[in-house]
Amino acid sequence: MAGARAGAAELGRSLVVVYPELGEPFRQVFASIIDGIEDKLGGSVMSLAVANNANPAGVAEDIRRRDIQVLIGLGRGGMRIAAALAGELAVLAGCVVSVQESEARSFPVHTLAPDPGLLLARLKRLKPGTRRVHLVYDPKLNAWLVKLAREAARAEGMELLAQEAADQAGALRAYTQLLASADPARDALWLPQDPTTVDDSTVLSLVLREGWNRNMAVFSSHVAHVRRGALFSLYPDNREMGRSLATAAQRLAAAPKAAVPGALPLRQTLAAINIRTAAHLGIDVAAAQSGFELVYPSN
């Protein structure tokens, strides 16, 4: 046990966390993640805030001059620095939204997309009669997530009906058609983190309005959508995410060549529910509220 703690502390001294220099609330998000990393490693770690206009090559050169073995890049700014050093250091990225598969070919990228298995288990608990889950997605961004979602749906006794859309016009057509033909008693609609197929004005307004009118469950990977009327969402537990990134960094330091590149879903989650929507769908609100950290509308 003491040896493990000593090893963790030693890693902390040779690890750097790089993140974008942003205002609140993002600064506090990164601070909580770093707190989790330090808690797991049992000591402070070097952290480096990088301005948006910083040259990744210059930042990478600064890091090369330090005695660093592992780099954790947070957000897109941190991921750019990780990419610049991927051939030299053990690197991983975390707290990243909407990752193209091409961006995750060289190192692991821990995204903010909630794990489909966690989302679908939550859906099954709230709406046990759900048999089919509809999803409209951009394959350049979310093909990896859809693969995981198909497996998760099978495990929950559901079928995933995923439609590809290359632009917002195609997404609107797909949503209009599926909302017109879906069976609200057995179908649900999932809004992923996908800027191509889910925008906060046209698409969200259409889906939430028609979902409400047809008594169909709409859940989302964006917690802000719950306030607008989506049934539920999962969102990051930032400190626990930091602890998980520290564990991944420990594995990476121990066996750099064993690291598997690619996008990974978020498993360190908290949950939000809209009880007005739940009541409208005939869900027992008192029972539904347990296990949710955020409840809308708030009293």
Write out the residue ranges for each language-model feature.
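Beta-alpha junction/loop-to-helix N-cap segments that form part of ligand/metal-binding clefts
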Residues: 49-99, 196-208
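Flexible loop/hinge segments that line or gate small-molecule binding clefts
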Residues: 87-116, 222-231
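Periplasmic-binding protein-like
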Residues: 18, 64-75, 134-136, 185-199, ...
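Structural motif
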Residues: 45-65, 167-180
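An alpha-beta-alpha
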Residues: 33, 112-156, 263-277
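Extracytoplasmic "Venus flytrap"
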Residues: 13-33, 48-51, 194
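Hinge/cleft segment of the Venus flytrap/periplasmic-binding protein
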Residues: 254-299
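Hydrophobic alpha-helical segments within soluble ligand-binding/sensing domains
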Residues: 99-102, 108-132, 236-256
